[in-house]
Amino acid sequence: MSRRKVCRFTVDGVKEIDYKDVNKLKAYITETGKIVPSRVTGTSAKYQRQLATAIKRARFLALLPYCDRHFN
């Protein structure tokens, strides 16, 4: 049996996910630039919504890439 996934944000007592914390956000993005779903990471629904918003803001401000690389 697999271990139950726990939400890291709940355990750490995070109130709100910051879009400027790029290193933490990178852990929730695949190599291709997609947001990892909560069923894989174990993130609760509340924090998954905040995470998606923070990643989208960071992408818009060019702190994170939209995809892994650009083709010519």
From Swiss-Prot:
It comes from the Bacteria. The keyword Transcription regulation does not apply. GO terms for cellular component: cytosolic small ribosomal subunit. InterPro entries: Ribosomal_bS18 (IPR001648), Ribosomal_bS18_CS (IPR018275), Ribosomal_bS18_sf (IPR036870). One of its GO terms (molecular function) is structural constituent of ribosome. One of its GO terms (biological process) is translation. The keyword RNA-binding applies. Keywords: Ribonucleoprotein, Ribosomal protein, RNA-binding, rRNA-binding. Belongs to the bacterial ribosomal protein bS18 family. Binds as a heterodimer with protein bS6 to the central domain of the 16S rRNA, where it helps stabilize the platform of the 30S subunit. Part of the 30S ribosomal subunit. Forms a tight heterodimer with protein bS6. This is Small ribosomal subunit protein bS18. The gene is rpsR.
